[in-house]
UniProtKB/Swiss-Prot annotation:
Heterodimer with ube2n. InterPro entries: UBQ-conjugat_E2_core, UBQ-conjugating_enzyme/RWD. This is Probable ubiquitin-conjugating enzyme E2 variant. Belongs to the ubiquitin-conjugating enzyme family. One of its GO terms (cellular component) is ubiquitin conjugating enzyme complex. SUPFAM superfamilies: UBC-like. Signal peptide: none annotated. The gene is ube2v. SMART domains: UBCc (SM00212). Coiled coil: none annotated. It comes from Dictyostelium discoideum (Social amoeba). Has no ubiquitin ligase activity on its own. The ube2v/ube2n heterodimer catalyzes the synthesis of non-canonical poly-ubiquitin chains that are linked through 'Lys-63'. This type of poly-ubiquitination does not lead to protein degradation by the proteasome. Mediates transcriptional activation of target genes. Plays a role in the control of progress through the cell cycle and differentiation. Plays a role in the error-free DNA repair pathway and contributes to the survival of cells after DNA damage. Disulfide bonds: none annotated.
Length: 138
């Protein structure tokens, strides 16, 4: 089995993020255009309709270390959010509590993580949680 080099995978993800494919509820790209290692990413999720997250904008930071895509990136919300997989002190997504991170394969991508987090917002257990005021940050 051929392994695709890390930078090729990340360049493909960058191109995909810049094209903004999908329904517009998630977006992502490099935090800095000068990041030649393609390590630090930012993402945005628009909360799902008919949930406490409805039309709120959630910002995240993702860090892809040298082992990406063989290991998942670290993911941290910068916008305060109350869902089961997010540490309420620092916004870090706990890999053990988000299936895409706990069952990571090298075929998963940043877009998949953001989509999975958006789906988590719609889960019945998370829909019941009281949310911080809009615009609050970690």
């Amino acid at each position: 089995m051929t392994t695709i080099p890390r930078n090729f995978v990340l360049l493909e993800e960058l191109e995909s993020g810049e094209k903004s494919t999908g329904d517009g509820t998630i977006s992502y790209g490099l935090e800095s255009p000068d990041d030649i290692l393609l390590s630090s990413w930012i993402g945005t999720i628009i909360g799902p309709q008919n949930t406490p997250f409805d039309n709120r904008f959630y910002s995240l930071k993702l860090y892809c270390d040298k082992d990406y895509p063989n290991k998942p990136p670290t993911v941290r919300f910068t916008t305060k959010i109350n869902i089961g997989c997010v540490n309420q002190q620092n916004g870090v997504v706990d890999p053990k509590n988000l299936p895409i991170l706990s069952n990571w394969t090298s075929k998963n991508r940043i877009q998949n993580i953001l989509s999975e987090l958006r789906r988590e917002m719609s889960s019945s257990s998370n829909k019941k949680l009281v949310q911080p005021p809009e615009g609050a940050n970690f």
